[in-house]
């Protein structure tokens, strides 16, 4: 009888990626099939996130519901992974002794063995260590699920922003070897993937070891991924202003596969608050990056992260943030009220901002960004947009759902054989959360690009004179 696996995922795209790898791993090693029904499952896995407030209590509430299932089905295996597991492993073991397996983001590759150990020893197994990049060497070959795919290129963060738990839960920055990243993407491309999103807590800090002992920069990686046959659209998330150098900006000038949309977190427009956050940039330095980007790619649209109500944030600090939002003209944002994370320096900062004031600031910020986003959407009316068809529309199964470069969903009438392909559509209507379009042309009429090899892309990126001095020639 086939064993069933349920994975519940909270948090960022890195967690979504990790959960997909857990499913691949347990499917390949033990023949588990995914289910969405907890009552059918033989293994229940919770992949957790510790970014938001009350993350731990949310975990224990979910585990309490699963405990009822385990009481009725004693052989049921319950596992907790992700950042809360790393941060609160011992506490989980004490408060929820019925949990069989506790693992961190860096040890998910050991999951099959940990499950077997818990079953044979009939006692909980925990491994929340940081074995750096080892997990990627022990995962099965990637399996494509549609025309888009996420690929993790690095783990961890070494910036230690005062509000953030990532360095403590995922470790410091470790880059995957270049060949491993390219091979995974090439495998996905062979399975029909057309768009790749490179993942990491700080992707532009990527420094991937190469087979010749050299180091590949993020800019070089972008060009090489863009050269892989079949990959026609390239995204990345999340990046950091500190390492968003001119070499990365130059990629926007000569690599059309890289989309005209960038998520670049700034968190605040107040230099005083940025200093308290240990963000090593000013608002002006951030705007300087955006100016260079728009010179390289005039139509690029920018999204960002914002924290309001950070301890000590005054009305002026908040207005500085609002000014930055208007000056940069952000298209989208992920914005939150500050939530103290245990173990971070900011958790000890005194805060006397009334809760209602925090909520009012958040509402004002979101209203401003939403109005800017709607204006951008209206500018797309009656224009042609190249979109990647992802599948049936979620609102009308007789229509198709596609995505623009600037991350907007477009619904349009078309046949199912267009799924996984690029098409051009004319935007005919604009809504708050989506667009409507009409099919103009299909992929066979496009002539998307001339294929270049990775070696040709590297030659384009790296040239050295007789003294060994490198120059970039676009």
Swiss-Prot record:
**Family annotation (SMART domains):** Elp3
- Domain TRAM: start-end pairs: 378-441
Q: What is its EC number?
A: 2.8.4.3
| Keyword vocabulary terms for this entry | 4Fe-4S, Cytoplasm, Iron, Iron-sulfur, Metal-binding, S-adenosyl-L-methionine, Transferase, tRNA processing
Residues annotated as binding [4Fe-4S] cluster 2: 157, 161, 164
GO terms for CC? cytosol
Identify the PANTHER family for this entry: CDK5 REGULATORY SUBUNIT-ASSOCIATED PROTEIN 1, MITOCHONDRIAL TRNA METHYLTHIOTRANSFERASE CDK5RAP1
**Protein name, per record:** tRNA-2-methylthio-N(6)-dimethylallyladenosine synthase
- Organism of this sequence: Aliivibrio fischeri (strain ATCC 700601 / ES114) (Vibrio fischeri)
Its gene?
miaB
